[in-house]
């Protein structure tokens, strides 16, 4: 008997546009509700750490390797006294080694790298070789804390939003009788995951998959959860990240895998059409997971 596979429906342009509008509405509502309050909370969290960094380094006038011996994690704060702030990877490249805490033999070199790119606007007194006055110090603390809080808030938002998506997808699957497989090992062959089961954050054919699902007909449904904060960002999230993984999984499993992107936030309409029509992805929205579970329930 010839197996007839069922596939999700491709959405029309108007259907994609409708889902996109609703997703953006929810995104804006959430940002407005959490924005200032969330930023203030993170600012108040990091501001004492910025003050401590200035205190330990004598207002950056005595920034040397001893600062990292005193606190090997203070480099995460001191990245933000640079102009512009130095990313973790850039600092590792400049120092010549990746680290979580500064190794003792790299303390002096790390201090030198940071000294060479200190912000001359926020910390003008360093170049002038003098102590800052109270106004200068407070302005520098405020500006540096704001930079750090902004970056930390963005990072946390991405992580929190993704975890929330994964949790909602998992709840929806359990609601239709699928069972969570808590194992974390790689999925290189289909039978690693039982039919009617799903997992969270497992490598599938070498690429991390947010929610891999073994459908009841034996195929693998690989779900990626993506949040985009704007149309430009959506191309990176959907086409480059999801599209790249989709191709990897197709090469490994062939017709036995389907790739789905569960989306929230702001996405360019042409990006959605490209993903669906050219990159072998099926698109669903976080605000309408019933459409996804309705499809899964058609597969016996």
Stretches with model-predicted labels:
Residues 257-300:
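Domain-level recognition of nuclease-like catalytic cores that cleave nucleotide substrates
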Residues 224-239, 264:
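Short beta-strand-loop-alpha-helix junction that forms the active-site gateway
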Residues 182-216:
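Active-site metal-binding core of divalent-cation-utilizing nuclease and nuclease-like domains
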Residues 211-213, 217-229, 242:
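Conserved catalytic cores of phosphodiester-cleaving nucleases, focusing on short active-site segments
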Residues 147-186:
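Solvent-exposed, charged helical/coil patches
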Residues 234-254, 276:
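Basic, amphipathic alpha-helical patches used to engage nucleic acids or provide basic targeting signals
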Residues 149-158, 194-199, 229-233:
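Surface-exposed cleft-lining segments at the edges of enzyme active sites
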Residues 1-139, 148, 152:
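Nuclease-adjacent, charged terminal/linker segments that flank catalytic cores
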């Amino acid at each position: 008997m010839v197996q007839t596979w069922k596939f999700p429906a491709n959405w029309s342009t108007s259907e994609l546009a409708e889902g996109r509008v609703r997703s953006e509405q929810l995104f804006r509502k959430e940002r407005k509700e959490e924005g200032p309050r969330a930023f203030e909370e993170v600012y108040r969290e990091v501001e004492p750490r910025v003050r401590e960094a200035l205190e330990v380094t004598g207002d950056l006038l005595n920034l040397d390797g001893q600062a990292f011996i005193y606190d090997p994690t203070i480099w995460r704060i001191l990245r933000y006294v640079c102009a512009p702030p130095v990313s973790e990877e850039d600092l590792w490249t400049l120092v010549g080694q990746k680290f979580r805490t500064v190794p003792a033999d790299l303390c002096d070199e790390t201090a030198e790298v940071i000294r060479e790119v200190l912000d001359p606007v926020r910390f003008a007194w360093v170049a002038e070789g003098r102590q800052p006055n109270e106004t200068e110090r407070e302005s520098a603390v405020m500006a540096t804390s704001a930079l750090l809080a902004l970056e930390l808030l963005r990072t946390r938002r991405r992580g929190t939003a993704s975890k929330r998506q994964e949790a909602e997808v998992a709840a929806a699957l359990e609601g239709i009788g699928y069972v969570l497989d808590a194992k974390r090992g790689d999925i290189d062959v289909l039978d690693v995951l039982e039919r009617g089961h799903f997992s969270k954050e497992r490598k599938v054919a070498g690429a991390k998959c947010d929610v891999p699902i073994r459908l009841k007909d034996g195929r693998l449904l690989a779900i990626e959860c993506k949040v985009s904060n704007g149309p430009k960002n959506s191309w990176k999230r959907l086409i480059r990240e999801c599209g790249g993984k989709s191709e990897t999984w197709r090469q490994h499993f062939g017709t036995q895998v389907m790739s789905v992107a569960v989306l929230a936030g702001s996405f360019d309409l042409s990006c959605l059409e490209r993903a669906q029509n050219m990159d072998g992805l099926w698109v669903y929205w976080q605000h309408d997971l019933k459409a996804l579970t309705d499809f899964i329930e058609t597969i016996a």
